[in-house]
Amino acid sequence: MGVAARPPALRHWFSHSIPLAIFALLLLYLSVRSLGARSGCGPRAQPCVPGETAPFQVRQESGTLEAPERKQPPCLGPRGMLGRMMRRFHASLKPEGDVGLSPYLAGWRALVEFLTPLGSVFAFATREAFTKVTDLEARVHGPDAEHYWSLVAMAAWERRAGLLEQPGAAPRDPTRSSGSRTLLLLHRALRWSQLCLHRVATGALGGPDAGVQCSDAYRAALGPHHPWLVRQTARLAFLAFPGRRRLLELACPGATEAEARAALVRAAGTLEDVYNRTQSLLAERGLLQLA
């Protein structure tokens, strides 16, 4: 007995559903309106992410992964995108325990540059991240720049000036969000990026593929802040995720698989350090519920 062919209409629908789903998900990925409207957290509530070490730091995940001894792969060198991203984010960690906004945003620019070639799922996400980065950079270099040199300074200034939103309330005009709220949205996206890269690097052969692992990371870091429709769209979008081997090749060109995995673990560790520092500062100031 033969297998009936799919009707042309069904094939046509399916061929367009994946790109459409990716577009719908990632257009809303860092959307101020969707995240703000769906918080569901009160002003005194704990962070909404289940399993998070709330309200402070996440558990350290990005341990070492050793590659055979060899010269450092180019992706971690002075001209490598991965190395450039790590150095900029690391520079944002101030000795006094603050987070410098200028190097943090420079790190995000490098992260966007790094993620964009990895596939359409990342490409749409990074467009929204780039918008948020540009918005914060305008404040860092704007007329109130003296108040936007670090996370602590920004939060203190916006509180004094009455610029902070009510917890869980989306601003009527997304373009007028506080810098603290915009940073919170980037902060959550950084957690997803960190988890995804770490799981791509450490996934075992024969285990869940990269799409499944990054989908799980989405559910942990961003899903609790998204409405049901966006979460369902995400599930479909991750079906188009590149395979692990392809991601490793794109992330660290010219390196062996072991070297690429080790490089990604180091990069994920840097992102985790920045996330933990930022998480603590936001929690101490009651800013985790701004969106």
UniProtKB/Swiss-Prot annotation:
Alphabetical UniProt keywords: Glycoprotein
One term under GO cellular component: cytosol
Cited SUPFAM superfamilies: Glycolipid transfer protein, GLTP (SSF110004)
Keyword Glycoprotein: yes
MF (Gene Ontology): ceramide 1-phosphate binding; ceramide 1-phosphate transfer activity
Top-level taxonomic group: Eukaryota
Biological-process GO terms, alphabetical: ceramide transport; intermembrane lipid transfer
Glycan attachment sites: N276
InterPro entries: GLTP_sf, Glycolipid_transfer_prot_dom
Pfam family, one: GLTP
Keyword presence, Coiled coil: no
Family, per entry: Belongs to the GLTP family.
Protein name in UniProt: Glycolipid transfer protein domain-containing protein 2
